[in-house]
Amino acid sequence: MLPRGIRNNNPLNIRRGKSQWQGLKAQQTDASFCQFESLEWGWRAAFYLLTRTYYINYRLYTIRKIISKWAPPNENNTEAYIQNVSRLTGIAPDETIGIPTIDAARWIAVGLAMAIQENGLSKREQNDACISFAEREDGRPKVNGPDSIDIFALLRGWTLCRQDG
């Protein structure tokens, strides 16, 4: 069975709340997490939260600070989450990620790594997702499958977020 975040088109498992996200399904059947019409809308919401709410409003500029708020220790193994995202991105936990409009690739990598963590992908699936972020050895992009994240939806979600001004 696909992970909950992928089934809900919500790769970072954004909790339901007051926000009326663009692209929400009209019928929300998950009591805890938002359900989006497509992965693009789920990624848009994720990148909006990361680059606007967390970066601009909360002034959280590092993996450690973002994840400590995103996945607090009372609900998660926060330090393991931080270390895994750092390992996957190559960005040190306390290193500034950068300005989203200038360092887009770093923010996209953080989002992808968080989705890998949130959706409990195995080491092999993590490697597949990271390979597909660029391209596979045969030169073709790895598109959506049961053991991958749809990288094209991720990039369209980033674009939707940036278009909102």
Predicted regions and their residues:
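Cell-wall polysaccharide-cleaving catalytic domain and substrate-binding groove, primarily
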Residues: 1-165
